[in-house]
Amino acid sequence: MISGEQTPTQYIQHHLQNWTVGEGFWAVNVDTIFWSVLLGVLFLWSFRRVAKKSSAGVPGKWQCFVEMIVEFVDNSVKESFHGKDKLIAPLALTIFVWIFLMNLMDLIPVDWLPTAAMYGGYWLGFVEDPHDVYMKVVPTTDLNTTFALSLSVFALIIIYSIKYKGVKGFAKEMTFTPFNHWALIPVNFVLESITLLAKPASLALRLFGNMYAGELIFILIAMIGFWQLPAHFAWAVFHILVITLQAFIFMMLTIVYLSMASSEH
């Protein structure tokens, strides 16, 4: 999209608008689903390809890179998850790589893919006005994505709590912590419920806030004309740290929360 065709406000709003089908509760952000699924498939395909071709001989560069990531995640799980569960390491690896890939889309110049989608839709006859086509390519700048991820973690927290503590143990934790007295059961339940619900909320909002702010800065940089290339590069170098850190934080907090849920005390 060429910023000169629109006012600055229209340009920013267009880039922050999802390709949405439907209305209200049944609205679906098609671009979010498309890019998140595509990146998930890319992750599975690339890692499976390495696993199938891995050998005891001299590994290639990509195999070394994948093995380094797997070892890093595996060590993180061993240090943070105080228990034995075969699901945690694959789950942590999936969370880290998938979120990293979704975040990484933020480094693509903001006009490239939306412009291709805009004029592609126009030339194919899907729309009469190219500006009626919207395309957000960073799934983690959509609250639907971050809350879907965090609510999945929340469901696992409940499942692991019941699995390791039993229904009775989980209920006791919710009603007799932190004050071990029957008269304070309502207070305990409210406090524990808030603590429990704060976990997925903080996971979702932290990831969304950091990525949304980063995307907005890239959009503002794209509006400054000739100097946008060096400015984009400078911000991208810094943003790589944010991208990686947010994926790592989400992974580590997931491991810690599940470790706490599986702890008997």
From Swiss-Prot:
Record localization: Cell inner membrane
Database matches in PROSITE patterns: ATPASE_A
Its membrane topology: Multi-pass membrane protein
Pfam family membership, one: ATP-synt_A
Recorded superkingdom: Bacteria
Cell membrane is among the record's keywords: yes
Residues annotated as transmembrane: 25-45, 88-108, 142-162, 207-227, 233-253
Keyword Nucleotide-binding (UniProt): no
CDD domains attached to this UniProt entry: ATP-synt_Fo_a_6 (cd00310)
GO molecular function: proton-transporting ATP synthase activity, rotational mechanism
Gene Ontology BP terms: proton motive force-driven plasma membrane ATP synthesis
Record keywords, A-Z: ATP synthesis, Cell inner membrane, Cell membrane, CF(0), Hydrogen ion transport, Ion transport, Membrane, Transmembrane, Transmembrane helix, Transport
Family membership: Belongs to the ATPase A chain family.
Subunit structure as annotated in this protein's UniProt entry: F-type ATPases have 2 components, CF(1) - the catalytic core - and CF(0) - the membrane proton channel. CF(1) has five subunits: alpha(3), beta(3), gamma(1), delta(1), epsilon(1). CF(0) has three main subunits: a(1), b(2) and c(9-12). The alpha and beta chains form an alternating ring which encloses part of the gamma chain. CF(1) is attached to CF(0) by a central stalk formed by the gamma and epsilon chains, while a peripheral stalk is formed by the delta and b chains.
Function: Key component of the proton channel; it plays a direct role in the translocation of protons across the membrane.
Name under which the protein is recorded: ATP synthase subunit a
Organism field: Idiomarina loihiensis (strain ATCC BAA-735 / DSM 15497 / L2-TR)
Primary gene name: atpB
